[in-house]
Each structure stands twice: as C-alpha cells, then as structure tokens.
UniProtKB/Swiss-Prot annotation:
The keyword Ribosomal protein applies. It comes from Homo sapiens (Human). One of its GO terms (biological process) is mitochondrial translation. High relative levels in skeletal muscle and testis. Lower levels of expression in the heart, brain, placenta, lung, liver, kidney, pancreas, spleen, thymus, prostate, ovary, small intestine, colon and leukocytes. Expression is coregulated with TWNK. It is found in: Mitochondrion. This is Large ribosomal subunit protein mL43.
C-alpha cells in the first residue's frame, strides 16, 4: 500500500495539552495475572515490587490487579479519550514490564499512525517558517541586484529624470543652478540650463489671489 493509502495525521496534542497545564491522558491500568502460572512470574514480581512506586509517580492513574487463573497475563490501559490498549506481558521480566507500563503512561491514546510533518501550526504565518534572514533587508547593502551589477545606468536614469522635470519660478525667487543633462544624440553629459516657465505667465495669477484675499 502506498503512503497516500495509509492513514496519517498532523502532529497535534489532545485539546492543546501542555499549553497551560499538562493532564496525563492515561486513566486506568488493569493487570490480569495468575497466582501460580510460570508465564506470570515477571508480572507478579512487578506487582509486588514496582507497582507502588509507579502509583506514586503517577497519582492520576488508577491501578487494578486481578489475580485469576489465566494463560496469558496482560495489561489493559484506558485513556481519557475512550481509547483502550491491551498489551501482553507473557513471560516478560520486571524491567520489560516497567518499560512497557511507562510507555503506556506517556502516550496520549491517539492512534499510532504516520505523522505527515514533524511540525504543525493552526494559524500559519504569511512569512512562512522562521529562518535567520527573517525581517532582514532583502537588498545587499541597500542596493537592488540590478544596481549592484551595473550602477552606472541607474545614475544616468536619475540624471535624465531630473533634467526632464520642469521647474516653475515665481517672481522674486532665486534662479536654480544649472543641472547636467544627457544629450540623446551623443549620449554624453553636457551642461545646459534647465527648462523653466516664464515669470510673465504667473503675473495674471498673483493679482487674482490678492483680490480674493482682500475681499
């Protein structure tokens, strides 16, 4: 079966467990052992020596021990979400049973299936995953990639735009300095006066503004 056909889920905890206070999901452990069966020797030793210490480390877990004639000893784990896990402890030592019980106590009760990604967020950011260059300037030393390769055309463009822009002079204002312009024929920089509007065209506007203000 392919990966798309197998069940999978995103990495998530039960009801955001651990965000505020951690609640252990294991609710109950039930041991079924035999009093005199050879296959239940390790389970009997675990109940006699280790079960009290496990109960002290996990005060929220209820432990039941059922001593009855059985061929295969087992432990049944019940979780808060209703999941039930049954594990066989047939002919296992005390150390193996302790490791198995601790694994059951650390689980959340969810199905052990394939995790799609090792990280997951319910509210993804438009910036994506954080990396060392997050919120850093995207240009190298303040220059765009085209300016880094050939800065001369960018300067020529700025000079050309400043030379073409018209300037309006009002009466009594000082004359602006001459700006270098680009000759379209020879493609060389020449010193020429910037184009400006005549001051005579502004004279009819000034009395009109004065009349409105005086009225």
């Amino acid at each position: 079966m392919t990966a798309r056909g197998t069940p999978s889920r995103f990495l998530a905890s039960v009801l955001h467990n651990g965000l505020g206070r951690y609640v252990q999901q294991l609710q109950r452990l039930s041991f079924s052992v035999s009093r005199d069966g050879a296959s239940s020797r390790g389970a009997r030793e675990f109940v006699e020596r280790e079960v009290i210490d496990f109960a002290r480390r996990n005060p929220g877990v209820v432990i039941y021990v059922n001593s009855r004639p059985c061929c295969v000893p087992r432990v049944v784990a019940e979780y808060l979400n209703g999941a039930v896990r049954e594990e066989s402890i047939h002919c296992k030592s005390v150390e193996e049973i302790s490791t198995l019980v601790q694994k059951l106590a650390d689980q959340s009760g969810l199905d052990v299936i394939r995790i799609r990604k090792p990280f997951h967020t319910d509210n993804p950011s438009i910036q994506g995953q954080w990396h060392p260059f997050t919120n850093k300037p995207t240009t190298f030393r303040g220059l765009r990639p085209r300016e880094v390769q050939d800065p001369a055309p960018a300067q020529d463009t700025g000079l050309r735009l400043s030379a073409v822009a018209p300037q309006i002079l009002l009466p009594g204002w000082p004359d602006p300095p001459d700006l270098p312009t680009v000759d379209p024929i020879s493609s060389s920089l020449t010193s020429a006066p910037a184009p400006m509007l005549s001051a005579v065209s502004c004279l009819p506007i000034v009395p009109a503004l004065t009349t409105v203000c005086s009225a």
